[in-house]
Each structure stands twice: as structure tokens, then as C-alpha cells.
Design a protein with these regions (language model features):
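Single conserved hydrophobic/aromatic residue that forms the stacking wall/gate
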Residues: 1-13
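Internal transmembrane alpha-helices of multipass membrane proteins
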Residues: 4-5, 28-75
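Helix-coil boundary and interhelical linker segments in multi-pass alpha-helical membrane proteins
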Residues: 15-28, 68-86, 155-163
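Structural signature of hydrophobic alpha-helical transmembrane segments
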Residues: 24-39, 87-95
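Membrane-interfacial loop-to-helix junctions in multi-pass transporters
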Residues: 30-38, 77, 119-129, 158-163, ...
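Transmembrane alpha-helix interface/packing and boundary motifs in multi-pass membrane proteins
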Residues: 42-48, 132-142
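Re-entrant/interfacial helical elements at transmembrane boundaries that shape
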Residues: 61, 101, 145-155
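Cytoplasmic/organellar membrane-interface segments at the starts of transmembrane helices
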Residues: 121-126, 172, 180-215
Length: 215
């Protein structure tokens, strides 16, 4: 019993010592704020250069996870709320996008964004699910991803990191480009190449339906 009480006291004191108030008072996490901002921008720029859809989504994941680290490093109440919320919103949105990328490969054997010409009309359900997931990741209202980014931006302003708020806005613009480009190519461009579609397993479509209905 004595050991249990001592352990609880140590945990409680540790949380108090290294909690958000400690980070705010000492500004010991400010370096992590700028490191997260650099990762957000660098990953977004690299994602734009990737023609492989899964590689593009992978670098997008690095960028989005840096949002969470940024919120924790800012350590304000709004930023922490945004970071916590972003864990959920990003998980739902990105799982949907990766499922769609997998479904496109299974049905059409296409991996590259540049090869998606005209596929939006041939795979409407998959592209519809992809669109919902992309809009949530970008943070377009009223999708749930908009709330987490809103709290992160407000948390940055609360900590007087105006430049960080601007970086988050620029990152969202980059998100628009590299996440919506596959949709634009799929519906606005045509290809002379014959693509033989293969029926995807029903489990793939059930998974897609479950993911974007939650988003």
C-alpha cells in the first residue's frame, strides 16, 4: 500500500512538473514549435513532387503528424485541444485516402497520379470517398478536419506565434494542391490508354463506406 501511494505521488508530481504550464513558463518547447513547422512545410513540398499516390499520402502523413506535435509544443489550451482532435480527424481521413489508393491499384493497377486520367468516371465510388477524405484532411468546413486546424491556428495566435498561424495556412494551401490534384486529373483529363478494370473485393468497398461515413 505504501509503495502504491509513493508511485501515485511520483506520477502526479511528474505530470505537474512537465505539464503545459511548465512549458509555457519556461518556453522550453519553442524550438520544437519551429522544428514542427519546418517538417510541415518540407513534407508538404516533397508530397507535391511525388507522382506515386501512396508516396504522396505518406509524406502527407508526416506533415499531418507534425500538426499534432506542433499543438503539443505550443502547449496552450486551444492548441492542445486542436492536437488531440487532429489525432482523430487525421486517422479517419488518411485511412480513407489509403484505402482509396489501394482500391484504385486493385481495380485498375494504377499507382501514379499522372495515370489517373479519366478514372474518376470509371471509379466514381472510390473517387467520391477519396474526395471526402481529402476535404477533411485539408480542413474544408464543415468537415471535421476544419475544427482541429481551427484550434491549432487559434492556439498559435494565443501563444503569439503569428508566423506559425501563417505557416499552417500555407500548409493547407499546399494540401489543396497535392490532395485534390488526383481528383482534377481523374475528372478533367482523358486517356487513350485502355484500362482493364477488375472488380475489387466487397470488403474493400465496405471498408471505404465505413471510413468516409464516419468522416
Amino acid at each position: 500500500l505504501w509503495y502504491r501511494r509513493q508511485r501515485q505521488m511520483c506520477i502526479r508530481d511528474s505530470v505537474y512538473i512537465v505539464g503545459p504550464e511548465f512549458l509555457l513558463q519556461t518556453k522550453s518547447s519553442d524550438w520544437l514549435v519551429w522544428l514542427a513547422c519546418f517538417t510541415i512545410m518540407a513534407s508538404s513540398i516533397i508530397a507535391i513532387t511525388k507522382d506515386d499516390l501512396k508516396a504522396r499520402l505518406a509524406y502527407s502523413t508526416i506533415s499531418q503528424l507534425s500538426y499534432i506535435i506542433l499543438g503539443a509544443a505550443l502547449a496552450s489550451s486551444l492548441a492542445l485541444k486542436g492536437a488531440s482532435f487532429h489525432i482523430i480527424t487525421h486517422a479517419l481521413g488518411k485511412i480513407t485516402l489509403f484505402f482509396c489508393a489501394g482500391a484504385i491499384y486493385v481495380t485498375a493497377h494504377i499507382k501514379k497520379v499522372s495515370e489517373l486520367k479519366g478514372m474518376g468516371f470509371k471509379l466514381p465510388l472510390i473517387f467520391f470517398a477519396y474526395t471526402l477524405g481529402a476535404l477533411s484532411i485539408i480542413g474544408v468546413p464543415p468537415f471535421i478536419g476544419s475544427w482541429s486546424k481551427f484550434y491549432l491556428i487559434m492556439g498559435s495566435i494565443e501563444r503569439e506565434f503569428i508566423v506559425v498561424a501563417i505557416i499552417l495556412g500555407i500548409s493547407s494551401l499546399l494540401n489543396i494542391y497535392y490532395l485534390l490534384q488526383p481528383i482534377v486529373i481523374g475528372f478533367t483529363q482523358t486517356s487513350r490508354r485502355e484500362v482493364k478494370l477488375i472488380k475489387a473485393p466487397l470488403t474493400v468497398f465496405y471498408s471505404l463506406n465505413g471510413n468516409f461515413s464516419d468522416a
